[in-house]
């Protein structure tokens, strides 16, 4: 097969990828680790991303959330953080968000005030999901995670 591609005029512009729950949650949690202000555009508006936003705030970051009027279907979020995670709240609720729960557990080991215990709770649906092997792995790495009846207690 032989294909010939002739040059055309320069293409200029931007393409906006559809919002993704997975990318949105990861972006929010990574922004909490950054020192300074991170801007996320077209963040998916969902229960999982709402849970992730609350977790990021509980870890000491400030969020400025605006509806994305340019494209009309996502959120624009400015996350300001020192890059040093602090536990502002002794209880963190992750709702139904498995990705938030699993990502925040190791992040809690990086807290400046990691000697202060923090309790993670989630929905009954999430409590039914397996997480024991993940907790055991994190404990082997030096974290002190204790599985309670309906929540998880973390202290380093």
Predicted regions and their residues:
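Structural preference for solvent-exposed beta-strand-turn elements
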Residues: 1-156
């Amino acid at each position: 097969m032989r294909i010939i591609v002739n040059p055309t005029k320069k293409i200029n512009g931007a393409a906006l990828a559809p919002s993704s729950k997975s990318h949105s949650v990861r972006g929010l949690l990574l922004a909490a680790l950054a020192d300074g202000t991170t801007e996320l555009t077209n963040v998916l508006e969902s229960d999982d991303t709402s849970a992730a936003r609350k977790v990021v705030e509980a870890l000491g970051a400030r969020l400025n959330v605006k509806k994305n009027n340019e494209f009309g279907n996502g959120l624009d979020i400015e996350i300001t953080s020192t890059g040093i995670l602090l536990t502002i709240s002794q209880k963190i609720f992750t709702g139904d968000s498995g990705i938030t729960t699993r990502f925040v557990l190791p992040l809690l080991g990086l807290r400046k005030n990691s000697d202060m215990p923090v309790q993670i709770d989630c929905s009954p649906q999430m409590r039914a999901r397996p997480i024991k092997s993940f907790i055991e792995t994190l404990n082997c790495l030096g974290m002190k995670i204790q599985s309670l009846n309906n929540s998880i207690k973390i202290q380093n």
